[in-house]
């Protein structure tokens, strides 16, 4: 039938835009289809048939329902064409044919954007958490790296100290303190140096080796109790002064060991200090002449009281007059090894009348041939004396025999003194003769022998003369192994001895103590033990056993008592000492700082033998290094 043809076309339109029609279950419209006006762009199909025989009522319900849907679709198409135009309609048809998704509305686009924002926020949160975790991980790694770096720095510092100590052991970088007992203590120069005391206009020496800047002088004082002493205050001060904090500075120094005990003096600049200075050997080979080999040390501590210092000087000059009267030839080109150590002064009121006044105030206060030292004192209360270029000269019958020139930069603090040490010049077994041309002239206190202190211009600043006196050859460590510094007198010689022990009894008790308790320690073929009383008196009985009945042997003296202890009895006067010497021996009191020793510190290597045997076959107990001129028993 003709009227069914447009219906097939409309069914195609319904399939194309079926979503615009009513639902499938909608009831059919009751009105009959009529001819629609031609309002659409295309010619509308004519539903009515010219054949009157055909009526709509005669159609079945299904056909009517299809016709109704076709009309609805036409109405919707007309409305859409009116709203959007022909082009929009064609675009929509093309999109539907191509299967493209329909255009989203503003609501759907906003929802999509919100979903995207939420996704981005979630991703940012995850990235933030990941970054926080990475930050914590990096901080932990940084902390571990910092700890590892600190451990490596500590290990490096320990290695530096160990290397410095090993260098001090194997060379003359550090100073070696050796006593007659075989004890050896190595103290490096850097350990006793405090850079805070260096003056601004004085440059610190550029020595080789490691610099240790973290030096605590209180710990140094506890570490080296034998290097620091404090004399008893004067009678004007009733209460003792507290132990001062040792705040000193010193240059680095190093000496080089050469054959036949030759030491080349190598100096650095010394700081100008009002309190004290300390140091060791320094590397400056140009500061010493090659003709004056030596091993020089500069050690110092705060000034002591006038009275205590004068007592010490009087004890040295009175009780040990036999030694102090001997002329010391300060330096020997082959064996001389002077050691320079500034120390607190001696009282100028008790100086010998033979001492001369000098424009600079420097004075030679003591010369000992037996102990081989010359002591120079700076009596000034404020000014620091400059010893640079000054010369110590010893004349015998008007001819120079010994010569020592102070290195550049040598400063002497006010109320301090320096001690120039020399080694033995001849063997104890085979004394040298004065006529020998190949060996140094033996140290003899002969008439006309004088010790002069000359300025760099040659002016005589101080002169010290001693009457003629023959002295025996040095008997203790004449082979050059006794290298001690003038630093401390010890009340006791043993390493673990009690410093507050009362003085030893007279000769009868000492003889019993020497002969009875030490018999078990003898070895076959060794001689009897002697007490370590003096480096100069120790081997007086070298040719045979002890002879207590021999009146030529001087009576031993007791070590000074501890100051501030009224319970300790004063030593009794002995037969060989005068009243003046006994009085000086009682007044000479020393305070020694002895505290706990930090053995973990690698700055000091202290090796103490149980027993030590000298080249003469004698054995003596082990003790810490002592200075023979200030801590002698005889």
UniProtKB/Swiss-Prot annotation:
Biased composition (Basic and acidic residues): 322-337, 540-550
Keyword RNA-binding: no
Low complexity bias (residue ranges): 276-287
Keywords: Coiled coil
A GO-annotated cellular component: lamin filament
Annotated GO MF terms: structural constituent of chromatin
Coiled-coil blocks: 106-169
Region: Disordered, residue numbers: 1-44, 228-349, 464-575
InterPro entries: Lamin_tail_dom (IPR001322), Lamin_tail_dom_sf (IPR036415), Lamin_tail_domain (IPR052877)
The LTD domain, residue ranges: 350-468
Polar residues bias (residue ranges): 228-237, 310-321
Biased composition (Basic residues): 502-513
Record-given protein name: Lamin tail domain-containing protein 2
Native source species: Homo sapiens
